[in-house]
């Protein structure tokens, strides 16, 4: 099982993304990831193993690297996510649950 959380805002949304994804932690224990998007700097993505620690502990130290007004986070028991996809429509961060 797994869970995901996404947000789009007119203001910076990294804190909402972090806490919203952390709230899904009870749905999986293997991998966690977040991706944020800023029109100035593009995508920033990070994926961590959660088998021996908590989501919050893994991501808190690099939270200042995430910038943007939109983002997606995932807790997964199967795959390392979010995936960055390039296609003729543009670049996307995608998760599957």
Residue spans of the language-model regions?
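N-terminal glutamine amidotransferase
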Residues: 1-97
């Amino acid at each position: 099982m797994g869970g995901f959380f996404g947000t789009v805002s007119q203001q910076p949304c990294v804190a909402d993304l972090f806490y919203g994804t952390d709230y899904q932690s009870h749905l999986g224990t293997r991998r966690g990831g977040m991706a944020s998007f800023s029109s100035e700097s593009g995508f920033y993505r990070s994926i961590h193993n959660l088998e021996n620690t908590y989501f919050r502990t893994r991501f808190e130290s690099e939270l200042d690297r995430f910038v943007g007004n939109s983002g997606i986070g995932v807790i997964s028991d199967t795959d390392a996510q979010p995936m960055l996809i390039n296609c003729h429509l543009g670049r996307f961060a995608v998760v599957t649950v």
